[in-house]
């Protein structure tokens, strides 16, 4: 199949056409029965990933770490966390991945490091240490009536409370936008940047990785002076820092500099991809990040569609939304690419999101499978690089009715403590928070992978091991890889079929452009068209438990039904009525 680059102005690339499978190493596969996933466990399941239809794996942080934030607090960028294995285990995993014809992408967490990293230990040792300026140190704004130091500004940590931690030794605060053991690195310091590139990027390029997923890549450039943030949450003394930390004044310069380092470092001709987690950005800013001619990022993740239904003031507050809101937000992932040399991504799940069937489908026993397949139809029909998160291909759902004590996520625990302190355990704020985490907590994605219905650990660990985190009880209900592999009607086998369809029609599924909504205001129907050369793809997707009617664009008879989530024997291709949670893809040539 020849991919034309006439429109949009894009070149075919391996990373554009790839389906990338994300692995959360702690929860994927435990090879030695210590309760934690590991490198050898991942290696043992690479064939499973290949058979699914994935072209690359992205592994969340596996570096040496105190694990205060599940490895996103890195103490040594050049060492594998011993619980996950050795560096040699990782190098062997990279080699096996390549032998199977897949690419290897690793996580790049360089907005912050761990407070156990040698860089920070040196920095905090004294005010005159040469690495003092590698982090953000500031004196207290003052002292309260009890003599406690007041943080330098009103910025809120993403994990609740102030974004500053007081260090007794030097009597100054350090900035940490995440948890107290994740000090932010000061990218204004050139020596700091060079050390980051060499240790976190260069070391792994030298060992054969094919790309980097760049964690919170929009936060490196803080506004000079670190001023107070505007008050948008009247119920808290801590405010979102986004206006002064996100997409800051030097952010594009920093990404261009790092991209140049990558290009200069790789000598064997392999093309390295970078995908930035850029949270929120205008279309123009997204184009600046991902324009091929600017040499910053290959593509980016945007959060608009996963944040629908959550308050901009505080994500753990749910607000009403309709299907139209989600449709518009989802299109923000890729519409800015049209007619440019930019690129983007398609995803519904990752390690920071709940299970998509619970969030956007219907996880009831009656509709879990069919709505899970519908979400698969949607994803394979959209343009951009497709990402699938471990367990998504099984149709995993959120765990149910867990008490707060079972949650592991530092974001949940810190926000719970902050709300309890500020408003009380029985407050309406706490009730809203608990309702929200039942739907959107990151922990829903982090339970151990469900390989079988083997008791008590679903094949993740041996029966005598104690996994690091509780299992989702749904493995006993058939939501596991072993049972689903034997069931031709399972979500797993449907995903294999869906990815084959996407590859067979990659010209219009991956590279399609001129996306247009049809019947945007419809509260149950998600339908659209997009084009590639002389082809048009039309998708009609029923996001409800009712049968609904739809119309083919221009009533054209040239559209042929190519793919859907109901068995073809049950579908009348000429029918204009969709069954509950039915999705169809038509193509006209």
UniProtKB/Swiss-Prot annotation:
Induction: By ethanol. CDD domains: AmyAc_SI_OligoGlu_DGase. Its EC number is 3.2.1.10. Pfam families: Alpha-amylase (PF00128). One of its GO terms (biological process) is maltose catabolic process. The active site is at 215 (nucleophile), 277 (proton donor). Alpha-glucosidase with specificity for isomaltase, methyl-alpha-glucoside, and palatinose. It comes from the Eukaryota. The record marks 352 as: Transition state stabilizer. Keywords: Glycosidase, Hydrolase, Maltose metabolism. PANTHER family: ALPHA-AMYLASE FAMILY MEMBER, NEUTRAL AND BASIC AMINO ACID TRANSPORT PROTEIN RBAT. InterPro entries: Glyco_hydro_13_cat_dom, Glyco_hydro_b, Glycoside_hydrolase_SF, O16G_dom_2. This is Oligo-1,6-glucosidase IMA2. Gene3D superfamilies: Glycosidases (3.20.20.80), Golgi alpha-mannosidase II (2.60.40.1180), Oligo-1,6-glucosidase, Domain 2 (3.90.400.10). The keyword tRNA processing does not apply. GO terms for molecular function: alpha-1,4-glucosidase activity; alpha-amylase activity; glucan 1,4-alpha-maltotriohydrolase activity; oligo-1,6-glucosidase activity; sucrose alpha-glucosidase activity. It catalyses: Hydrolysis of (1->6)-alpha-D-glucosidic linkages in some oligosaccharides produced from starch and glycogen by alpha-amylase, and in isomaltose. Belongs to the glycosyl hydrolase 13 family. The lineage of its organism: Eukaryota, Fungi, Dikarya, Ascomycota, Saccharomycotina.
């Amino acid at each position: 199949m020849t991919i034309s680059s006439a429109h949009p102005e894009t070149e075919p690339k391996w990373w554009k056409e790839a389906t990338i499978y994300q692995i959360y190493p702690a929860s994927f596969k435990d090879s030695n029965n210590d309760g934690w996933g590991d490198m050898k466990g991942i290696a043992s399941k690479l064939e499973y990933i290949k058979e699914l239809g994935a072209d690359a794996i992205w592994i969340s942080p596996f570096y040496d770490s105190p694990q205060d934030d599940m490895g996103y607090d890195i103490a040594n960028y050049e060492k594998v966390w011993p619980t996950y294995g050795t560096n040699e285990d990782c190098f062997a995993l990279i080699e096996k991945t390549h032998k199977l014809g897949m690419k290897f992408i690793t996580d790049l967490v360089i907005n912050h490091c761990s407070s156990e990293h040698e860089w920070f230990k040196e920095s905090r040792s004294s005010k005159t240490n040469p690495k003092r300026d590698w982090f953000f140190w500031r004196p207290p704004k003052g002292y309260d009536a009890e003599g406690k130091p007041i943080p330098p500004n009103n910025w809120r940590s993403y994990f609740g409370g102030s974004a500053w931690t007081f260090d007794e030794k030097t009597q100054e605060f350090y900035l940490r936008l995440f948890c107290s053991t994740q000090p932010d690195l000061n990218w204004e310091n050139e020596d700091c940047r060079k050390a980051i590139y060499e240790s976190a990027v260069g070391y792994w390029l030298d060992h054969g990785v094919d790309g980097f997923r760049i964690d919170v890549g929009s936060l490196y450039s803080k506004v000079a002076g670190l001023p107070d943030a505007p008050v948008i949450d009247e119920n808290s003394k801590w405010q979102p820092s986004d206006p002064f930390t996100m997409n800051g004044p030097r952010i594009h310069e920093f990404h261009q500099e790092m991209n140049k380092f990558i290009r200069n470092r790789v000598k064997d001709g392999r093309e390295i991809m970078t995908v930035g987690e850029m949270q929120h950005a205008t279309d123009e800013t997204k184009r600046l990040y991902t324009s091929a001619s600017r040499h910053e990022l290959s593509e980016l993740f945007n959060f608009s569609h996963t944040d629908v239904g959550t308050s901009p003031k505080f994500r753990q507050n749910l607000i009403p939304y309709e299907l139209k809101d989600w449709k518009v937000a989802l299109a923000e992932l890729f519409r800015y690419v049209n007619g440019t040399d930019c690129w983007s991504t398609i995803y519904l799940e990752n390690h920071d999101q709940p299970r998509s069937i619970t969030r956007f489908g219907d996880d009831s026993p009656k509709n879990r499978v069919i709505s899970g397949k519908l979400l698969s139809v949607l994803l394979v029909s959209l343009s951009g690089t497709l990402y699938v998160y471990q367990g998504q291909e099984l149709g995993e759902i959120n765990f149910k009715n867990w008490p707060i004590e079972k949650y592991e996520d530092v974001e949940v625990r810190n926000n719970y403590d902050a709300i309890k302190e500020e408003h009380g355990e029985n407050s309406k704020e706490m009730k809203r928070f608990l309702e929200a985490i039942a739907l959107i907590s990151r922990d829903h994605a982090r339970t151990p992978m469900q390989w079988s219905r083997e008791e008590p650990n679903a094949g993740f660990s041996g029966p005598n091991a104690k996994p690091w985190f509780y299992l989702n009880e749904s493995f006993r209900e058939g939501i596991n890889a072993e049972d689903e592999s034997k069931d031709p009607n399972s979500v797993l086998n449907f995903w294999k079929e869906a990815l084959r369809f996407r590859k067979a029609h990659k010209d219009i599924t991956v590279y399609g452009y001129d996306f247009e909504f049809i019947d945007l205001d419809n509260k149950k129907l998600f339908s659209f068209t997009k084009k590639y050369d002389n082809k048009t793809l039309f998708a009609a997707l029923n996001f409800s438990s009712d049968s609904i009617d739809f119309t083919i664009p221009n009533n054209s008879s040239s559209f042929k039904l190519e793919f859907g989530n109901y068995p073809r024997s049950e579908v009348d291709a000429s029918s204009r009525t969709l069954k509950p949670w039915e999705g169809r893809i038509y193509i006209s040539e």
